[in-house]
Amino acid sequence: LAFDDDKNTRYGVRKEDECGPVLNTGMFFAMKEMGDVMGTFVGHEHVNDYIVDYHGIALAYGHFSGWRTTYTREINGVRVVLLKEGQREFDTWLHSLDGAIRDRVTYPTAFIND
């Protein structure tokens, strides 16, 4: 839902559908209610590596970090997250095994739509 909504700023790629749970446990609502959650970082969708702002919370995938799958030729790497002490802000980017860095953004600054 978050990635599909053109109003939501996003960086990175989506190459396969997300596998959300069948049961809505209210986790996202609880994070919103807490008021101090800036983002959540997940993996498993092997070739998704995007970050999107959804109602003031960054939803971010890591990067393909395993080794060889039967259906992708993606080079492995990681999502780096650099928290800024005392600020409600973080930097994040994708760093591939070959040294390439892409989609370097500062949250929430890069996601503010004027």
Name every feature range the model reports, one short phrase each.
Residues 1-12:
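Metal-dependent phosphoester/phosphodiester hydrolase catalytic core
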Residues 10-19, 25-34, 48-114:
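Binuclear metal-dependent phosphoesterase catalytic core
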Residues 40-48:
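Histidine-centered catalytic micro-motifs
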